[in-house]
A protein has these predicted regions:
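Terminal targeting signals and extreme-terminal segments of soluble enzymes
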Residues: 1-162
Length: 162
């Protein structure tokens, strides 16, 4: 039986959180396990629209990110994921504070994965909900390609035998 390698997860978190887009938005994936991810973001002025509330694109990016990483642990090591569809329901505006995003796998198939993500504030108020459909792409947009693009040497294997 294959189990996730905790050393791989630790290295992936370090890698992705240093990525250019995550840095641009100042978001962090802080938890990653089979079927689940957790992303946090402390709202800054750069996240706000001209009216002083959160820009809808920030909600979309957070939901897309949390959904992607919620199914990452379910795909083979040499496969990547590409978002096919993203549906976002903006349920409440927010102007400040920490956003907590929980991604949960709905289904991980051979070709298509579906996950949802919920965005909360610190008081557990639901701010946004979204669903992402992702295509499994063997050999395309793999974690090893991210390793190369960011100048890292390598990662520990994704799975270990039990």
């Amino acid at each position: 039986m294959q189990n996730l390698n905790p050393e791989h997860i630790k290295a992936v978190l370090e890698l992705i959180n240093r990525g250019p887009f995550f840095s641009l938005l100042s978001m962090e994936v802080c938890e990653l396990r089979k079927g689940y991810s957790k992303v946090v973001l402390d709202l800054e002025n750069k996240h706000l629209n001209p009216f002083g509330g959160i820009h809808g694109g920030v909600y979309s990016s957070l939901i897309d990110t949390a959904a992607y990483w919620a199914v990452y642990c379910d795909v083979e090591e040499d496969a990547g994921l590409i978002s096919l569809d993203l549906k976002v329901d903006n349920l409440a505006p927010v102007k400040e504070g920490r956003l907590i995003v929980e991604g949960k796998k709905i289904k991980a198939g051979r070709n298509i994965c579906i996950a949802e993500a919920l965005i909360f504030n610190r008081q557990s108020k639901l701010l946004a909900h979204g669903i992402s459909k992702q295509m499994v792409t063997p050999g395309l947009q793999t974690i090893n390609q991210a390793v190369s693009a960011m100048g890292y040497e390598s990662l520990p294997p994704k799975f270990i035998n039990d």
